[in-house]
Regions:
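Glyoxalase I/VOC metalloenzyme domain signal
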Residues: 1-93, 104-125
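Short, small/polar residue-rich loop motifs at catalytic or cofactor-binding pockets
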Residues: 98-100
C-alpha cells in the first residue's frame, strides 16, 4: 500500500482476524449520502467505523503473484450473470456465502472479474 495509498488518497485499515485491508477514501460516505444514497450512514450504523468510506479491499494471497481483481457490486447476481452470458461471458464459478452471492466471470476478451450481490444474513441491514 506504500505506493497505491498516497497515489489515490486511500487510507488502509486492517480488518480483523487477518481478513485483509479495507481501502477508504475519506468523505466518500458523505458524498454518497449527499448524492445517491441518503440512508447509507443509518444502514451502516452497526458496521465498523468509516465503512461508508470503503471503496475496496486488499487481500494478499500466499504464493500468488501480485495482480488486481475487480469485484462489481450488483443488485441481483443471477440477472447480472444471465446478462453477462448473453454478452459472451463465461461463468467460472459461483458461490452463496454468508453475506454475499458471488460469481466469477471471464469476459469475451479473457479478463476475469466478480459480480457480488450483498445478502445480509438477517435479510436487512
Amino acid at each position: 500500500m506504500a505506493f497505491y495509498a498516497p497515489l489515490f488518497g486511500w487510507l488502509a485499515v486492517d480488518m480483523a482476524q487477518g481478513a485483509g485491508t479495507m481501502l477508504q477514501v475519506p468523505g466518500y460516505g458523505d458524498h454518497l449520502a449527499a448524492t445517491v444514497d441518503p440512508g447509507i450512514h443509518e444502514r451502516q450504523a452497526a458496521a465498523p467505523p468509516g465503512f461508508a468510506d470503503v471503496i475496496g479491499s486488499l487481500v494478499v494471497a500466499p504464493d500468488e503473484p501480485a495482480h488486481w481483481h475487480v469485484t462489481f457490486t450488483v443488485a441481483d447476481r443471477d440477472d447480472s450473470v444471465a446478462t453477462a452470458e448473453r454478452l459472451g461471458a463465461t461463468v467460472l464459478r459461483s458461490a452463496d456465502e454468508l453475506w454475499t452471492r458471488n460469481a466469477l466471470l471471464r469476459d469475451p476478451q479473457g479478463a476475469e472479474f466478480t459480480v457480488s450481490q450483498f445478502t445480509p444474513p438477517d435479510g436487512d441491514w
